[in-house]
Amino acid sequence: MSCPVIELAQQLIKRPSLSPNDEGCQALMIERLTAIGFTVEAMDFGDTQNFWAWRGTGKTLAFAGHTDVVPSGDESHWQHPPFEPIIRDGMLYGRGAADMKGSLAAMVIAAERFVAAHPNHQGRLAFLITSDEEASAVNGTVKVVDALMARNERLDYCLVGEPSSTHVVGDVVKNGRRGSITANLRIHGMQGHVAYPHLADNPVHRAAPALNELIATEWDRGNDFFPPTTMQIANIQAGTGSNNVIPGELFVQFNFRFSTELTDVLIQQRVAELLDRHQLNYTIDWKLSGQPFLTARGELVDAVVNAVKHYNEVTPELLTNGGTSDGRFIARMGAQVVELGPINATIHKVDECVSAADLQLLSRMYQRIMEQLIA
């Protein structure tokens, strides 16, 4: 298939950029962007490659994304090697095809076409690209945003190319995301022999009622923009592996995906009150991964909705569900942030794939968004 979007997507997929490694993906993008007049600034931190690129001045529309991918798993389960992209029955197969090298290719080709049609565009077109979104996300977008904010860079609109769609391209657009906070809880007891429980203090038994209450609690009811806050236990560990030893400690890790009805501070307070009420001897550490954010209807949302309607004749559903994305960092700059990308049915799975026609369509949507906001 001779199509610049598909050809670039295949070139990117061929590079096994397991997070946080980039494996030359960004160099490929930078070469294309500099050829059409972009200024590119490498902003590497630690083991992570990032770049910030821009062309023009004025109101800024940035396209954000990541070149890293998750591991492929057992490659023998794939119908075709994950880093040897192939098109079969109109589908482009390969690790990162949907998440999110297909989007990156669509963005770059959209920029090339936009600049060719509008060489003297009025606003500023920018790219914020990282190689660490799938793993720790410590040295990626968050560090670039910190650096840009420190020098008072302006960002008005940001389109994140995460795979947002469900059935057809653009049927779902993410105009916000829930916050995420994780608790690492340790319940302290006293180790002993299972035959002499009166000489020990079993932290599993002590914690069970509190954990049941954590699970049963309605944290909030959500609102017009966010579903209710959820709490899920992710890991539990106790014991020595022996069937005759009462454990001395219980480790429980649980995560909240929270709406704007709550704050991370309120969550921590409510959990502490619950644990104290059950008279547990515990220590707890919290890790905040991101605050919730929301982009209300405005110029960016309207431009995205218009582009999707124009090319796919569907009205996007604006949702805030799902996992976190780097949009949570970019929103700190005061920018309107929206996620629009391909269908997410196969992301992180064996035989990850995306419709080649969908990527072509997505690139046209991206171009139309550019034309509406900064032409």
Swiss-Prot record:
Pathway of action: Amino-acid biosynthesis; L-lysine biosynthesis via DAP pathway; LL-2,6-diaminopimelate from (S)-tetrahydrodipicolinate (succinylase route): step 3/3
EC number, UniProt record: 3.5.1.18
Keywords: Amino-acid biosynthesis, Cobalt, Diaminopimelate biosynthesis, Hydrolase, Lysine biosynthesis, Metal-binding, Zinc
Co-factor binding details: Binds 2 Zn(2+) or Co(2+) ions per subunit.
TM stretches of this protein: none
Family membership: Belongs to the peptidase M20A family. DapE subfamily.
Active site: D68, E133
Named cofactor requirement(s): Zn(2+); Co(2+)
Function: Catalyzes the hydrolysis of N-succinyl-L,L-diaminopimelic acid (SDAP), forming succinate and LL-2,6-diaminopimelate (DAP), an intermediate involved in the bacterial biosynthesis of lysine and meso-diaminopimelic acid, an essential component of bacterial cell walls.
UniProt keyword Cytoplasm present: no
Gene3D superfamilies: Zn peptidases (3.40.630.10)
A matching Pfam family: Peptidase_M20
PANTHER family: ACETYLORNITHINE DEACETYLASE, N-ACETYL-L-CITRULLINE DEACETYLASE
Subunit structure, interactors included: Homodimer.
Binding site for Zn(2+) 1: H66, D99, E162
Binding positions (Zn(2+) 2): D99, E134, H348
Cited SUPFAM superfamilies: Bacterial exopeptidase dimerisation domain (SSF55031), Zn-dependent exopeptidases (SSF53187)
Alphabetized GO MF terms: acetylornithine deacetylase activity; cobalt ion binding; succinyl-diaminopimelate desuccinylase activity; zinc ion binding
Catalytic reaction list: N-succinyl-(2S,6S)-2,6-diaminopimelate + H2O = (2S,6S)-2,6-diaminopimelate + succinate
Protein name: Succinyl-diaminopimelate desuccinylase
Organism from which the protein derives: Pectobacterium atrosepticum (strain SCRI 1043 / ATCC BAA-672) (Erwinia carotovora subsp. atroseptica)
